[in-house]
């Protein structure tokens, strides 16, 4: 008899896996109404235009990074490590929001098993409607396509399945919103930071950096900013007497975004005499353009030009054992 399993879906943004994938990736990103809230009738035409305009410039970033984002490989490795921890009672799959493997690919994998429950586990420690919320919405949309027979062709790979629609119309789905203050997650962050610090780290200034958001989203009630600040505060309880601040990166467009911006904060700190910086990505758990290009290349060069004596960027968690343990605990608590 086939054993029933709990499906675990790791949700992440995704990134282009080749230079040719950059424009369609950007198109998918700017087509997301949870991020860019413009009238829906013009959303896709605007997304097509923006993606074409930005693709050439973005391609240069990815050429510096080796021609692709490493996020897919790192997320799949996180899934593999988590699968090993959970063993055969669970089936762990990956659903990216803007590039392969997409949500429907994750659903196809789950269809091959006898699933009794699904747990959605975002790889975004802090909740935002633009990240976790968007991934939840996309998952809900794709599930509805599966349980509407005859309207969509996505079930063609399931030929011979006795009753494919039974699955997602009857299975309970648990959604983990966030874990920004989870003790194991904080422990993972602290361990990862300590493992990459120089001996004289107390002579450094800790600069935490997170993905920025339009200020209006926060004013409308999104908890992302407050949760990110809480994460930083909990981490810094383990580093007494070290000076620190939080900044935001990756602003796009003319509207007002969360500040201070990371590059401007670097400039301010160096001008004020803090010439030894430890830069800590706090909202990312894998490497991508915002860490490898912005933090390492762009901001690293800015710091050097401004006279920084040392600029150390802490790696993201990736498959850090304590982070995988965090994910395991979250899954078990929601099983």
Curated annotation (Swiss-Prot):
Biological process according to GO: heme biosynthetic process
GO-annotated molecular function: ferrochelatase activity; metal ion binding
HAMAP family with a match to the protein in the record: Ferrochelatase
SUPFAM superfamilies from the UniProt entry: Chelatase
Top-level taxon of the source organism: Bacteria
Gene Ontology CC, one term: cytoplasm
Pathway: Porphyrin-containing compound metabolism; protoheme biosynthesis; protoheme from protoporphyrin-IX: step 1/1
Pfam families on file: Ferrochelatase (PF00762)
The protein's name: Ferrochelatase
Family: Belongs to the ferrochelatase family.
InterPro entries to which the protein is assigned, alphabetical: Ferrochelatase (IPR001015), Ferrochelatase_AS (IPR019772), Ferrochelatase_C (IPR033644), Ferrochelatase_N (IPR033659)
Binding, Fe cation: 211, 290
UniProt xrefs under Gene3D superfamilies: 3.40.50.1400
Catalytic activity, EC: 4.98.1.1
UniProt main location, coarse: cytoplasm
Gene name, Swiss-Prot/TrEMBL: hemH
Protein's job: Catalyzes the ferrous insertion into protoporphyrin IX.
Keywords of the record: Cytoplasm, Heme biosynthesis, Iron, Lyase, Metal-binding, Porphyrin biosynthesis
UniProt-annotated location(s): Cytoplasm
Catalysed reaction, written as an equation: heme b + 2 H(+) = protoporphyrin IX + Fe(2+)
